[in-house]
């Protein structure tokens, strides 16, 4: 078992591994311990993942190193964990987008110093003008006096 495969197993509960194994085994018709790359998308969708054709091609290219056209269960686990992490990343970005919309009170696509101060006041935090200025300086990478969504995402990376 490679380090990558051991890490994938450590990320999953025994229950999840058993669920993945059951799905994997359904497509391992001959019981040989591997499935064809063609069946991979079907198995992933059955397990609640939604890879695009491009994502599936990229995943398969990474996993099927020997070009055999088959993927064993350990390779499958590594791939599923990768896909789960990608899905989680997408969800957290959606949540951050919702936060940004709430913070952007005037809906102009930016958080300005007044809106930032209002966020803290609404949460009961007392912040000084200097603290707001410092936060703006940290988040406002292009120095236009306001924080756009990309700057907000970068700012929030350190918080999560």
Curated annotation (Swiss-Prot):
GO BP annotations listed: regulation of muscle contraction; skeletal muscle contraction
The keyword Metal-binding is assigned to this record: yes
Effect of residue 79 to I: In CMYO15; affects regulation of muscle contraction
GO CC, one annotated term: cytosol
Sections of the chain in a coiled coil: none
Keywords in alphabetical order: Acetylation, Calcium, Disease variant, Metal-binding, Muscle protein, Repeat
Effect of residue 34 to Y: In CMYO15; affects regulation of muscle contraction
Modified residues (N-acetylthreonine): 2
Keyword tRNA-binding applies: no
InterPro entries attached to this UniProt entry: CALM/Myosin/TropC-like, EF-hand-dom_pair, EF_Hand_1_Ca_BS, EF_hand_dom
Residues bound to Ca(2+) 1: 28, 30, 34, 39
PROSITE patterns per the UniProt record, alphabetical: EF_HAND_1, EF_HAND_2
Binding site for Ca(2+) 2: 64, 66, 68, 70, 75
EF-hand domain segment(s): 15-50, 51-86, 91-126, 127-160
Gene Ontology molecular function terms on file: calcium ion binding
Binding site for Ca(2+) 3: 104, 106, 108, 110, 115
Binding site for Ca(2+) 4: 140, 142, 144, 146, 151
Remarks, miscellaneous: Skeletal muscle troponin C binds four calcium ions.
Family per similarity comment: Belongs to the troponin C family.
UniProt function note: Troponin is the central regulatory protein of striated muscle contraction. Tn consists of three components: Tn-I which is the inhibitor of actomyosin ATPase, Tn-T which contains the binding site for tropomyosin and Tn-C. The binding of calcium to Tn-C abolishes the inhibitory action of Tn on actin filaments.
Pathological association: Congenital myopathy 15: An autosomal dominant myopathy characterized by neonatal onset of hypotonia, muscle weakness, and respiratory muscle involvement resulting in severe respiratory insufficiency. The disorder improves over time, although forced vital capacity remains decreased. Other features include facial weakness, often with ptosis or external ophthalmoplegia, jaw or distal joint contractures, scoliosis, and osteopenia.
Record-given protein name: Troponin C, skeletal muscle
Biological source species: Homo sapiens
């Amino acid at each position: 078992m490679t380090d990558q495969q051991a890490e994938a197993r450590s990320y999953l509960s025994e229950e999840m591994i058993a669920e993945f194994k059951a799905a994997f085994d359904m497509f391992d018709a001959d019981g040989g311990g591997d499935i064809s790359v063609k069946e991979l998308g079907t198995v992933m969708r059955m397990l609640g993942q939604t890879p695009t054709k491009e994502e599936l091609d990229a995943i398969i290219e990474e996993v099927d190193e020997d070009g055999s056209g088959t993927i064993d269960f350990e390779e499958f686990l590594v791939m599923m964990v990768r896909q789960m992490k990608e899905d989680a990343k997408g969800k957290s970005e959606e949540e951050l987008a919702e936060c940004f919309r709430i913070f952007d009170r005037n809906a102009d696509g930016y958080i300005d110093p007044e809106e930032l101060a209002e966020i803290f006041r609404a949460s009961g935090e007392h912040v000084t003008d200097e603290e707001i200025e410092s936060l703006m300086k940290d988040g406002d990478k292009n120095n236009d006096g306001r924080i756009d969504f990309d700057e907000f995402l970068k700012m929030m990376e350190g918080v999560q």
